[in-house]
Amino acid sequence: MKRMMEERVYGISLEVLYQEGIYSLYRMPCLGGTGCMKRYALLPGVDLVYSRYDAGSCLTQSPVIGTLMEINHCRHGRFECEFRMGSYAYLAAGDICVNMMGHPTSSSSFPLNVYEGAAIILDLPAAQQSLARAFPGICLDLNRLQQRLCGEGDIFVNHSTPVIAQTFDCLYAQENVLTPDYALLKVLEILLLLRDMPEESSGGVPYFRKEIALGVRALHDDILRQPDVHLPIEQLCARYSIGSTVLKSAFKAIYGQTIYAFLRECRMQAAAASLEGGGKSIAAIAADVGYENASKFSAAFRGVMGISPSQYRQSRCMRSL
């Protein structure tokens, strides 16, 4: 029965590594990396989950269960969720997402190849009864909360308010010594904070059409392959058939930095690898990564790496002695 419940809520592909009482540890199937999930079954219908992924994607598809509400908080990394309707939503570090799991997803991936976060999973009918019994003096209508945040079919994605972020931080701090009573109080606190959150805090959903997300991903991969190539934004828009404003905002939403900040970082990483080799002059390395002016290259390198190219080369030579 317990295994059937796990598969119903979390999918059939997870591997149980350890179980004792309300605690379960799972290995998640990932593409090109590893993932694990810790689950605390606090009450019937109320789960607290910690997730960590060092991978590009998780291969477990979310089940379609209309009564399940998922409250995700991203601590580190980026989370991309592709909906079968053909749109993409993104959760960034410090963001919170509320989603009804009756809205199917076809895949989940991590654009930065890393993700760490926590989630509260509520089976609304069971959770409503459990919380009412555990906290009889608290007025909390989970269906009304779901309607307020998600409406008739949307997901809610926004930056955490400072107090919600602080409450999740408490859960992260206690992860390895978590007690059920403490966890349950923090879960209740988060639900009440969401209930009482001002209307102006419930902003729009940063999602993008599939062709935009795929175009931005292609741009990202092209930069990784050819960091020395610098194209004006107009040419990038023409190449990927995306408008300037959307291209800039989508790239930052997915990868957490501007196009040209990412380009500069890739160039400096390539330059650092060449400097460690020791064979080329700094001027030649600057030209290799797209800089005609060695002084501008040195300034850019210092901005990313914290030291000048010559200092970087010298420090690497000293380490090899």
Feature roles, as predicted:
Residues 50-52, 70-72, 116-123:
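Short hydrophobic beta-strand segments that form the core of ligand-binding sensory/regulatory domains
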Residues 217-225, 229-230, 234-237, 253-295, ...:
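Terminal helix-turn-helix DNA-binding modules in bacterial transcription factors
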Residues 82, 88-213, 233, 238-244, ...:
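Alpha-helical bundle regulatory/interaction domains
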Residues 1-65:
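N-terminal low-complexity or simple alpha-helical regulatory segments
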Residues 256, 290, 301-302, 306-309:
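Conserved phosphate-binding and hydrolysis motifs of nucleotide-dependent enzymes
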